[in-house]
Amino acid sequence: YLESDLTDYNAESVKADWGLYFRPWANDFEIQYVGKVGTGSTIYQGAQRYRIDGFSLQQHKLEVKNDNFFVRGYITSDKAGDTYVMDVLGPNLLNAWKDHGTWFGEYVGAYASATLGGATGAEAHAAARATAEMGRPQEGSAAFNRLLDNVTSDTNFLTGAGFKDNSKIYHGDANYNFGDLVSFAEIQVGSSYRTYRLNSFGTIYADAEGPISYSELGLYTQLQRSFELNESLELKLTG
């Protein structure tokens, strides 16, 4: 089969984002929710060649803040849609119709028979292929489309070409500025936390038995003080 028989070269991308901002009390206190979503299809060329079909990515953020602090959290998730690896699609599609061992056996037998009958190499090859590929579904036929659907939805790369991904990232940040409470310096403390949840069902990561999760945590503090040495020179120390 030609690659054009096995895939769709159309590319598309749809994106949207929105936000809700609420200030219930003072102008410096705000609650906000921001969402982003995108979906698309294309051909991707890397170490292998992929048909990215119906891939989607979304992110949602909730944040509470004022002039002295903020607390915010994100969740980012993706879905692979009906994506498949084009490198293995052709061979596995043919193997699903007729296993490679049977095909090569029929080919070799027909080639040898044609050669013994006086055919040239090109003639023997044509006759052998015609014998081995008798009944092969034609591209676009109902039988071909059934095979294509079965192989692209099969995530075992020995027999199929599809892969799945439904990974997520959870992230949170918090920061407080003691500027209104301490006058001799500007003091800030904060933290950052992130959890990765890899979930490719064994098609990308080694997670066939279940999602892989791992986390990161960071803490920080900052002290800053300014010294006005004269009207045109100021010294800032940060630690």
Where are these regions (language model features)?
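Structural signature of outer-membrane beta-barrel domains
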Residues: 13-15, 27, 34-42, 72-81, ...
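Extended, low-complexity, charge-balanced
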Residues: 56-58
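Short secondary-structure boundary micro-motifs
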Residues: 4-6, 45-46, 160-162, 209
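Transmembrane beta-strand segments that form the barrel wall of outer-membrane beta-barrel proteins
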Residues: 35-39, 45-48, 233-239
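Face-selective signature of the C-terminal outer-membrane beta-barrel domain
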Residues: 61-239
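Amphipathic, alpha-helical segments enriched in basic
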Residues: 30, 37-39, 46, 90, ...
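Transmembrane beta-barrel wall of Gram-negative outer-membrane proteins
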Residues: 1-39, 60
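Surface loop/turn motifs at the tips and blade-to-blade linkers of beta-strand repeat domains
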Residues: 52-53
